[in-house]
Curated annotation (Swiss-Prot):
Keywords attached to this entry: Membrane, Mitochondrion, Mitochondrion outer membrane, Transmembrane, Transmembrane beta strand
Main location: mitochondrion
Record's keyword annotation contains Transmembrane: yes
Single GO BP term: mitochondrion-endoplasmic reticulum membrane tethering
Annotated membrane topology: Multi-pass membrane protein
GO cellular component: ERMES complex; SAM complex
Organism lineage: Eukaryota, Fungi, Dikarya, Ascomycota, Pezizomycotina
Family listed: Belongs to the MDM10 family.
Primary role: Component of the ERMES/MDM complex, which serves as a molecular tether to connect the endoplasmic reticulum and mitochondria. Components of this complex are involved in the control of mitochondrial shape and protein biogenesis and may function in phospholipid exchange. MDM10 is involved in the late assembly steps of the general translocase of the mitochondrial outer membrane (TOM complex). Functions in the TOM40-specific route of the assembly of outer membrane beta-barrel proteins, including the association of TOM40 with the receptor TOM22 and small TOM proteins.
Protein's UniProt keywords contain Transcription regulation: no
Entry text on domains: Lacks alpha-helical transmembrane segments, suggesting that it resides in the membrane via beta-sheet conformations similar to those predicted for other outer membrane proteins and porin.
The protein, known as: Mitochondrial distribution and morphology protein 10
Length: 443
């Protein structure tokens, strides 16, 4: 289960228009979420609130052998008005779904030759424009360890932003560490530079997109085959594949410990306009360590997603595989007992089957305009929550060592719960390892 503060952090990117899929860091995000979901240990309680559209708080309390917890505060310079904060009404798919489909690229900006050049801004105007850009501050304190975590995000322009993360604790070397990054994104590519005080780490990441929607077109893809004559428009419109290839890599070097690392990766993911089955395939290579990894994730149905990963090391000849799945359900067993479904059943009114049709009451708009409704003026039907919203999800994973992880998540009234356990099938005498329950409430 994603924490409420992570959900708000992601909503900040959506509100400010930051494109998240142009980061090499998120290349394997879909497969990782399907096969590396966290299992709760012990009992964990979370209480969160979006007090204002700009400010949110979260409190966590855990009892897994010992009592611990954390306090989180988040402030955004832009109001997050589109965030559904109530745990009673928040869509479960937005909070619990692991399969994340790659979104369409942001619109391409017109070339410099198509628009007249704008006057060069003065340094004062540039500073004023920088101050107006969105920013976010996040802080979290862990108890009783007294560890402090902080994060600051500042947009410098629509395509450039700065991000600083820090952790402070007495047990860490030098009392803590700071990681700073500069991220620049365009519709076709995204790059990032990293600097960390932990070992003097310097890093660079980049991701380039090609194929699919990376080439702007003057006509809409719906025009393909839309003309019955099929002639001119079909010839002028290029063939489009409803998937996008992405290739990138990262390179980092530790100045103090004289260590280096590199990674290369390729991803193919279908786009939302794809009419077939959504899928994501990735391949990564770490040449210095000799690790090769490939993963494949598919949303077989709206209620079922599957993923698999295979890892191999060319130096030690060791291999590893993992499979994962999530299965959504609409019944009561999927989400325990959804009281809203019972309320809907209690509100069902018998339909009058008599020959006389009951006169429909005038709409509110017609009453305000002192007129009668038109014959074809009908109110849109209300969405059926039973059909459009899932009640819960069952997640499972297993590796080659017969270690199984099971997670059951759903909603009970205004509480979102997560019940998980891990089982080792290779050792029947010690098969049951742990059981945990996490409960989250937000308003």
């Amino acid at each position: 289960m994603r924490q409420f503060e992570d959900y708000v952090l992601e909503s900040f990117d959506h509100t400010t228009g930051w494109y998240q899929d142009n980061s090499y860091e998120s290349l394997n995000r879909t497969a990782d979420q399907l096969m590396q979901f966290r299992l709760p240990t012990g009992l964990k309680l979370s209480f969160s609130s979006l007090a204002t559209p700009n400010f949110s708080t979260s409190y966590h309390l855990g009892a897994g052998g010992r009592f611990d917890g954390s306090i989180c505060y988040l402030f955004s310079s832009v109001p997050l008005k589109n965030v559904v904060s109530s745990s009673e009404s928040i869509p479960l798919t937005a909070l619990l779904r692991s399969y994340r489909q790659v979104q369409d690229l942001p619109p391409f900006q017109p070339s410099h030759g198509a628009v007249p050049p704008a006057p060069t801004p003065t340094p004062g105007e540039r500073l004023q424009e920088f101050v107006k850009q969105p920013w976010l501050v996040f802080g979290r304190m862990f108890l009783p360890e007294s560890m402090l975590e902080a994060q600051v995000v500042k947009r410098a322009s629509p395509n450039l932003r700065f991000q600083v993360k820090g952790v402070s604790q007495a047990d860490l070397p030098n009392g803590g560490t700071i990681l700073g990054s500069v991220q620049y994104t365009k519709p076709r590519y995204g790059v990032a530079g990293l600097l960390s005080t932990d070992g003097g780490l310097l890093g660079f990441r980049g991701l380039y997109n090609f194929g699919g929607d990376t080439t702007p077109t003057t006509s809409s893809p719906r025009a393909v085959g839309g003309d019955e004559n099929g002639g001119a428009n079909g010839c002028d419109e290029r063939e489009r594949i409803y998937g996008r290839f992405s290739a990138g890599g990262e390179l980092y070097y530790g100045v103090l410990n004289k260590s280096a690392g590199a990674s290369l990766g390729v991803r193919f993911a279908t786009l939302p306009a794809h009419s077939g089955t959504p899928l994501t395939a990735t391949f990564t290579l770490a040449p210095l360590m000799g690790n090769i990894s490939s993963s494949f994730a598919v949303m077989a149905r709206q209620s079922c997603s599957l993923a698999t990963r295979f890892d191999f090391n060319v130096y030690s000849y060791e291999s590893d595989w993992t499979i994962g799945m999530e299965l959504w359900g609409k019944g009561r067993m999927a989400g325990l007992i959804d009281r809203r479904l019972e309320e809907e059943e209690a509100q069902i009114v018998p339909v009058d089957m008599g020959p006389a049709e009951k006169k429909r009451e005038r709409s509110f708009q017609a009453k305000m305009e002192w007129r009668l409704d038109e014959d074809d003026e009908t109110e849109p039907p209300l969405p059926n929550k039973r059909e459009e919203e899932f009640s819960g999800v069952l997640k499972a994973r297993m590796d080659q060592h017969s270690k199984v992880g099971l997670l059951w998540e759903g909603r009970l009234k205004s509480l979102i719960f997560s019940l998980g356990t891990s089982v080792n099938l290779s050792k029947p005498e010690q098969s049951f390892r742990s059981l945990g329950l996490a409960i989250q409430y937000s308003s």
